[in-house]
């Protein structure tokens, strides 16, 4: 084991004081934190690392196929908190949902094949410029959609140079296999599975997306469950440190939770290696690019200040 790695025992020891503080918070009522997990990712991380051992509150897990579904559940109050990429979060926040980002993480190294635009192996499409007049499938407001908009812009193409088809990841996979679409803007594990099956990458997120993901919480959860929520976030940050040197362990749990093949789960873990980062002015400035991209595409009309999208409960 590398000297700078975080063992499960060290992780739990470091979290002991946090759990004790939560226990002494004065909240004697039954406490339940409803956590949304995309394709099992957050749940597998917390279970494999042992980060939730010793908590004095209950965690209820709900699984979602994509960020949009998770954010809709957050907006309705069906879950208290869940992890989502910066693009879908901004899309949802500007739609008026009562949610805020309460902690930030960043893919490390900066994302490449974690978010991609794919074409069939034998497609004549060789570059983003070749997408003019073609059909791209993705989920509206997703990180895949954001990558497509950025890639089109870099290639000198406006958004209406292509036809976007809005599909769930599962439906898109079927459409991609049947060739009813020309390209697919997607993310892991869907991208990893498609690449394994022969899909070809024509664009990735390198230098086009920031790689930020946020734990997003309902405003009522922030107000009523702040101590529990903050404890969960601190434990998650420690779990990310653990995962950086325990990818195979994390992947095994992820495969068990989701049914993904172990090689796909390991690829997903390695391509989405993340670290906790502060919600600071640099991050907010970076996020203005995301907001401006969606605005330029006519997708959103920002009516909420970006600075108010964040509730930095860990730094208060």
Write out the residue ranges for each language-model feature.
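Secondary-structure end/capping motifs
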Residues: 41, 224-299
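N-terminal export signals
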Residues: 3-4, 10-25
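Solvent-exposed, polar/charged alpha-helical surfaces in well-ordered, non-transmembrane soluble domains
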Residues: 72, 76, 90, 129, ...
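Short acidic capping loops at alpha-helix termini that bridge into adjacent secondary structure
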Residues: 127, 159-163, 263
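Conserved C-terminal helix/tail region of periplasmic/extracytoplasmic solute-binding proteins
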Residues: 294-316
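Pocket-lining segment of extracytoplasmic ligand-binding domains
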Residues: 87, 165-255
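Short, glycine-/small- and polar/acidic-enriched structural segments
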Residues: 29-155, 182, 207
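Short helix-loop capping/hinge motifs at secondary-structure junctions, enriched
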Residues: 121-128, 157-158, 220-229
């Amino acid at each position: 084991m590398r000297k700078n790695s975080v063992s499960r025992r060290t992780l739990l020891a470091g979290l002991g004081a946090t759990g004790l503080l939560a226990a002494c918070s004065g909240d004697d009522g039954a406490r339940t934190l409803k956590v949304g997990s995309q394709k099992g990712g957050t749940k597998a991380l917390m279970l494999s690392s042992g980060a939730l051992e010793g908590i004095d509150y209950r965690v209820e897990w709900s699984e979602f196929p994509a960020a949009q579904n998770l954010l809709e559940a957050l907006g309705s109050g069906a879950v208290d908190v869940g992890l989502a990429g910066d693009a879908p979060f901004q899309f949802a926040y500007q739609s008026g949902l009562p949610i805020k980002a309460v902690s930030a993480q960043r893919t490390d190294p900066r994302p490449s094949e974690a978010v991609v635009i794919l074409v069939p192996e034998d497609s004549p499409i060789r570059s983003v410029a070749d997408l003019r007049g073609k059909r791209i499938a993705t989920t509206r407001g997703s990180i895949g959609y954001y990558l497509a908009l950025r890639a089109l812009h870099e290639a000198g193409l406006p958004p209406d140079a292509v036809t976007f088809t809005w599909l769930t990841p599962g439906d898109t996979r079927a459409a991609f296999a049947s060739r009813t679409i020309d390209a697919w803007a997607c993310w892991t594990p869907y991208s990893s599975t498609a690449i394994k099956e022969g899909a070809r990458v024509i664009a990735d997120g390198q230098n086009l997306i920031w790689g930020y993901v946020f734990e997003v919480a309902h405003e009522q959860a922030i107000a009523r469950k702040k101590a529990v929520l903050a404890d969960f976030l601190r434990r998650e940050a420690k779990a990310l440190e653990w995962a950086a040197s325990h990818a195979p362990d994390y992947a095994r749990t992820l495969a068990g939770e989701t049914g993904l093949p172990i090689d796909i789960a390991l690829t997903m873990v390695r391509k989405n290696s993340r670290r906790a980062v502060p919600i600071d002015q640099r991050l907010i400035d970076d996020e203005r690019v995301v907001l401006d991209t969606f605005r330029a595409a006519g997708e959103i009309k920002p009516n909420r200040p970006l600075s108010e999208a964040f509730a930095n409960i860990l730094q208060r």
